[in-house]
Amino acid sequence: VLNDVPLSARIFNEEPFGPVAAVRGFEKIEDAIAEANRLPFGLAGYAFTTSLKYAHLLAQRLEVGMLWINQAAAPAAELPFGGLKDSGYGSEGGSEAVEAHLNTRLVSIMNA
């Protein structure tokens, strides 16, 4: 887990794969959404909030194929798996895999 990482760091400008997370706080939800959508990648997103209003706003505005709010990823065979933008087109797993030309999103919100 990394914090106090400058925005110019590779982890904030590439799509990292591996056991690493760069944690960053934001004053305004709009700034967090803009930063999350800034790059051409959209595999998955994770957010932690006590606000159900913010959880729904993130679900509507984040450009990711899978969104996990207030929980770790919990993939299962019956759930869609896949990203948007340069992270993929369509999804694997679940009945959504049959509809390979759609951008299907998974949003899971656990009330905090």
PLM-predicted stretches and their roles:
Residues 1-112:
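Conserved C-terminal structural/oligomerization subdomain of aldehyde/semialdehyde dehydrogenase
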